[in-house]
């Protein structure tokens, strides 16, 4: 839980272990060769529903732990869980489970999601958040900067003075 102004302040955090059955379902779905974005399966819909409800429960527990109401929260960003990420295929797509509309309805908090798919539709490689974050907090009008973010998928952001910020995935990370 963050408060973001011209700096980021961590208010609180809460995590739970992913239920093993759900984790196993997600791993199996990620191994599927078929385009699940165009051809969703019953298993995908079930995993999406389970992950969505797990997310809602974590949000509610975090609010309770923090002694906050949903009306105290401006917005919730939900990346979801990536099942397939194919930004460079003939028909580029990225598929995450965790339905932001249902999360919003059940928490009463405006929920923003589908970051990767929206970025791909607009010509990106599906990693839109890190460049925006880096631009806001690390841009310097007098210096060029390159920031490398090593996660499951590594990405790079170029902050070039007097030019538009650009960023992209570079490949596997940790």
Task: Name each model feature, range by range.
Residues 1-174:
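Short acidic/glycine-rich loops and adjacent helix/strand connectors
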